Amino acid sequence: MAVQQNKKSPSKRGMHRSHNALNTPGLAIEPTTGETHLRHHISATGFYRGRKVLKTKADA
């Protein structure tokens, strides 16, 4: 089992954890429907950047 050589100080512990924070997801608003979706992803209505790119069950 691994055993640490020296105790890590609170400052070094904080520096080690400095990149662990979670970021909020990048959300975009579809201009045609006003729906919120993840950036670079198709909205639930099948629109991407103002154009219909996928047929949905509601369209059929």
Swiss-Prot record:
InterPro entries: Ribosomal_bL32, Ribosomal_bL32_bact, Ribosomal_zn-bd. Pfam families: Ribosomal_L32p (PF01783). GO terms for cellular component: large ribosomal subunit. Keywords: Ribonucleoprotein, Ribosomal protein. Residues 1-36 are annotated as: Disordered. Residues 9-19 have a biased composition (Basic residues). One of its GO terms (biological process) is translation. It comes from the Bacteria. GO terms for molecular function: structural constituent of ribosome. PANTHER family: 50S RIBOSOMAL PROTEIN L32, LARGE RIBOSOMAL SUBUNIT PROTEIN BL32. Belongs to the bacterial ribosomal protein bL32 family. This is Large ribosomal subunit protein bL32. It comes from Methylibium petroleiphilum (strain ATCC BAA-1232 / LMG 22953 / PM1). The lineage of its organism: Bacteria, Pseudomonadati, Pseudomonadota, Betaproteobacteria, Burkholderiales.
